[in-house]
């Protein structure tokens, strides 16, 4: 299982919070102090909290649970997508559409439409249409892909949600809370930790910090899945004795 050290976090700038005037008092237990009017996060708290979160994600992934990565702001968007794809999981990195989880039935219809359009695009159907109609369908497909592409193969609700920036993604967190889906989130000094099951106090703006978080989660999921495959193979008698 991936673990992250204090050195890794210092190098990535995880300890830099927001300006002191923007702080959320609920984050006080995780703040070490302030420097140049910027809060410094106490990494002695963050390191074990993040590693505890990774241990729990490891358990979920080992039993084939689905992990949804959520990070829609510009700094997080690319890392969230890359990390989710690298471990064969799911992501929302453009805009959280209200009801994405709580109104899954409707979302499923939109995903079905997206897949229909993808088939039409691939099998030459678009070429048989008028230019205008083909353009309209292409635009519809691109729009759906942008908002739902990361969850089109999820096949149901996720078993865990990993979030970058609890404040920015508060709607997603609320939906997960309503459905009893555990929430793992990076929570900066200006954010409200309420509704987050596994709080990870840390910088949620620096790209290097975000890459550290998403990369560690992706590695944890991959290793848990691989371990599960090995165990299954041993049970089925497919692993040769060394």
Curated annotation (Swiss-Prot):
GO aspect biological process, one term:
translation
The answer to whether the entry has keyword Ribosomal protein is yes
This entry's Gene Ontology molecular function terms read:
structural constituent of ribosome
PROSITE patterns per UniProt: RIBOSOMAL_S2_1, RIBOSOMAL_S2_2
Tell me where on the tree of life, at the top rank, the source sits: Bacteria
Recorded hits in CDD domains, A to Z, give:
RPS2 (cd01425)
Instruction: Provide a GO CC annotation, any one.
Output: cytosolic small ribosomal subunit
Which named protein is this? Small ribosomal subunit protein uS2
Name its species. Answer: Photobacterium profundum (strain SS9)
């Amino acid at each position: 299982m991936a673990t992250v050290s204090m050195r890794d976090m210092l190098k990535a700038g995880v300890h830099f919070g927001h300006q002191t005037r923007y702080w959320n008092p609920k984050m006080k237990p995780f703040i070490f102090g302030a420097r140049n009017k910027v809060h410094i996060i106490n990494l002695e708290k963050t390191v074990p909290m993040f590693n505890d979160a990774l241990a729990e994600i490891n358990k979920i992934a080992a039993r084939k649970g689905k992990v949804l990565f959520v990070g829609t702001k510009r700094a997080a968007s690319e890392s969230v997508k890359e990390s989710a794809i690298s471990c064969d999981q799911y992501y929302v990195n453009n805009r959280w559409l209200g009801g994405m989880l709580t109104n899954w039935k409707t979302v499923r219809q939109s995903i079905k439409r997206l897949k229909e359009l993808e088939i039409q695009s691939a099998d030459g159907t678009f070429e048989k249409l008028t230019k205008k109609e083909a353009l309209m369908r292409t635009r519809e497909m691109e729009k759906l892909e942008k908002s739902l592409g990361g969850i089109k193969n999820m096949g149901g609700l996720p078993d865990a949600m990993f979030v970058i920036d609890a404040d920015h993604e508060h709607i997603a967190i609320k939906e997960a809370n309503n459905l009893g889906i555990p929430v793992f989130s990076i929570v900066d000094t200006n954010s409200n930790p309420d509704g987050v099951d596994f709080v990870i106090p840390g910088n949620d703006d620096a790209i290097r910090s975000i890459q550290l978080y998403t990369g560690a989660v992706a590695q944890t999921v991959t290793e848990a899945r691989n371990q599960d495959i090995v165990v299954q193979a041993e049970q089925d008698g497919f692993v040769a004795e060394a």
